[in-house]
Amino acid sequence: MFIKANADGYALALYDLHKEEKHVSSTYENILSFYELLSNDKEVFSFFNSSKIGLEEKHKIADELVQENKNLKTFANFLKLLISKNNSPLLLQALSIYIRLVESELNILRAKLISAFEIDNQTKIKIIEKLENKYNKKIKLTTFIDKSLIFGFKIVIGNDIIEQNAKADLEKISSLINNKNGDLNG
């Protein structure tokens, strides 16, 4: 289906309204959670995009958001507008743009911490503190487990990768061994 609407326009409109209402920071966590739910749960995403589910039912869900937090009224109206105009396929993209705008204003960087094993909260706090000092921004850390790392960790922040793990070390050694001009093969 061809969509003539612009996700940037929707995101900017929501951002400007929240800024005007001074609700940018008070709604950030809720909207981020909603975005993550849509991104990770295909059933929820399909609900908003389904032509078989009526507008009233979708609008009811948007209204329920306001029950949790009165500052989300503009966001609920934003959802209803997208749904009413049959632009729900733009929802993820518009929210992604909106979140980037808000994170820029609030000086927030998102980081992924990928490790071979679960990392305790104390260590996460230390990592966040070090990253906040390095980047001079508030860090939102999301953790993932990747057994292929064997031990150690990898932190991804935008295009930056900080890694200390066995998998990366083994790949470097392998590349040296296989490289004809490398140190080991002369």
UniProtKB/Swiss-Prot annotation:
It is a peripheral membrane protein. It is found in: Cell membrane. Keywords: ATP synthesis, Cell membrane, CF(1), Hydrogen ion transport, Ion transport, Membrane, Transport. Gene3D superfamilies: N-terminal domain of the delta subunit of the F1F0-ATP synthase. InterPro entries: ATP_synth_OSCP/delta_N_sf, ATPase_OSCP/dsu. One of its GO terms (cellular component) is plasma membrane. The keyword Ion transport applies. One of its GO terms (molecular function) is proton-transporting ATP synthase activity, rotational mechanism. F-type ATPases have 2 components, F(1) - the catalytic core - and F(0) - the membrane proton channel. F(1) has five subunits: alpha(3), beta(3), gamma(1), delta(1), epsilon(1). F(0) has three main subunits: a(1), b(2) and c(10-14). The alpha and beta chains form an alternating ring which encloses part of the gamma chain. F(1) is attached to F(0) by a central stalk formed by the gamma and epsilon chains, while a peripheral stalk is formed by the delta and b chains. F(1)F(0) ATP synthase produces ATP from ADP in the presence of a proton or sodium gradient. F-type ATPases consist of two structural domains, F(1) containing the extramembraneous catalytic core and F(0) containing the membrane proton channel, linked together by a central stalk and a peripheral stalk. During catalysis, ATP synthesis in the catalytic domain of F(1) is coupled via a rotary mechanism of the central stalk subunits to proton translocation. This protein is part of the stalk that links CF(0) to CF(1). It either transmits conformational changes from CF(0) to CF(1) or is implicated in proton conduction. Belongs to the ATPase delta chain family. This is ATP synthase subunit delta. It comes from Mycoplasmopsis agalactiae (strain NCTC 10123 / CIP 59.7 / PG2) (Mycoplasma agalactiae).
